[in-house]
Amino acid sequence: MGCCYSSENEDSDQDQEERKLLLDPSNTPTKALNGAEPSYHSLPSARTDEQALLSSILAKTASNIIDVSAADSQGMEQHEYMDRARQYSTRLAVLSSSLTHWKKLPPLPSLTSQPHQVLASEPIPFSDLQQVSRIAAYAYSALSQIRVDAKEELVVQFGIP
């Protein structure tokens, strides 16, 4: 876990040259070791990558946008409008005929014929509400304490040989 470098040794010019070449790849020689020209692939810069990414996002967004202002703004003729209205009303009639059970039910349950009298009457006394709550708690307690004890077997074996 360390490096094998001693700071006591002075760097020679050749060591500094090698270090400079290793750290700065733009200063590499143009000839390869075998004498052929090296082919360096230039990596795209961060700015180019960012620009390409933004361009792809813009293209994707442009393909998903519907330009309403560029659409043909031709108005419908009167007979086309009437045909569509007739078509929609026949479709609604077919759909509403299949939902007849919804029409038969009142919008809200009617518990009384004169709800204004019920709403105008005196509120239920608090003592009555407490009594109903107490009775409900006793009923719950009684139901939760019901136990079934098995006195005999549920399946009885008959004497069949």
UniProtKB/Swiss-Prot annotation:
Residues 121-161 are annotated as: Interaction with LAMTOR2 and LAMTOR3. Keywords: Endosome, Isopeptide bond, Lipoprotein, Lysosome, Membrane, Myristate, Palmitate, Phosphoprotein, Ubl conjugation. It is a lipid-anchor. This is Ragulator complex protein LAMTOR1. It is found in: Lysosome membrane; Late endosome membrane. It comes from Rattus norvegicus. Belongs to the LAMTOR1 family. It comes from the Eukaryota. Transmembrane segments: none annotated. Part of the Ragulator complex composed of LAMTOR1, LAMTOR2, LAMTOR3, LAMTOR4 and LAMTOR5. LAMTOR4 and LAMTOR5 form a heterodimer that interacts, through LAMTOR1, with a LAMTOR2, LAMTOR3 heterodimer. Interacts with LAMTOR2 and LAMTOR3; the interaction is direct. The Ragulator complex interacts with both the mTORC1 complex and heterodimers constituted of the Rag GTPases RagA/RRAGA, RagB/RRAGB, RagC/RRAGC and RagD/RRAGD; regulated by amino acid availability. The Ragulator complex interacts with SLC38A9; the probable amino acid sensor. GO terms for molecular function: GTPase binding; protein-membrane adaptor activity. The keyword Ubl conjugation applies. Ubiquitously expressed. Changing residue 2 to A: Loss of localization to the late endosomes and redistribution to the cytoplasm. N-terminal myristoylation and palmitoylation mediates its recruitment to lysosome membranes, thereby promoting localization of the Ragulator complex to lysosomes. N-myristoylation by NMT1 is required for palmitoylation at Cys-3 and Cys-4. May be palmitoylated by ZDHHC3.
